[in-house]
Amino acid sequence: EEEDDDEDDEEDVEVDISKCKVTFDEDTHPYTGKAVKPEFTVSYVDEDGDDVDLEEGEDYSVTYSNNRKVSKNAKIKIKGITDNCTGTLVKTFTISKAKQKITAKNVSVSLSKKSVNLKAKCSTGTLKYKSSNTGVAVVDSNGKLNLKKKGKTIITIKAKASRNYKVAKKKITVTVK
């Protein structure tokens, strides 16, 4: 009986991780508030010229560093963990600023209320407000609307960029009746 040599050959292949190719599934890795662990593939080219993927946990281990904040220098360290898969490779990736979301709703309110709070929120917590028609309503730095007369105004709400978030802007309509 002949044995299938292909299985044995594959076991005998020695792979130096430092010569492997690392391919990220996504080009960008936005800030999440947690450790960023991008999806990636580690592969090598076999003697037939084909790409062969290695398996995390079977062929190599992964450790991360500098991967919690926006950085151009977040790192993945890939280390061979078998007799046939040895060596170490460090790959750098970038964590970009995340989009910031402002939550605020259009407001319809009676003039008799005199004032109302917009209750706007964002990722960084710091918001600036501007009323397009201060004759209808004036808004203070805390998002409190002081109602002046019946009508409509557009309130522009801005969140400044921060270390981890991009600038954001949202417009809401305030109707005073």
How should these model regions be labeled?
Residues 22, 31, 40-42, 60-62, ...:
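Fold-core signature of tandem repeat domains
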Residues 17-19, 26, 57, 73, ...:
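Surface-exposed or flexible loop/turn and strand-edge residues in extracellular/cell-surface modules
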Residues 1-12:
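Long, acidic low-complexity intrinsically disordered regions
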Residues 99, 113-116, 128-143, 147-157, ...:
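Contiguous, function-dense segments enriched for cysteine-driven chemistry
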Residues 11-50, 96-126:
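Solvent-exposed, low-complexity, repeat-rich "mucin-like" stalks and linkers
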Residues 1-2, 93-97, 174-177:
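Interdomain boundary/hinge segments at the C-termini of tandem beta-sandwich modules
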Residues 25, 45-46, 74-93, 158-168:
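Enriched for extracellular/lumenal, surface-exposed ectodomains of secreted and cell-surface proteins
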Residues 47-86, 130, 135-156:
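Serine/threonine-rich, repeat-prone extracellular segments and beta-strand-based repeat modules
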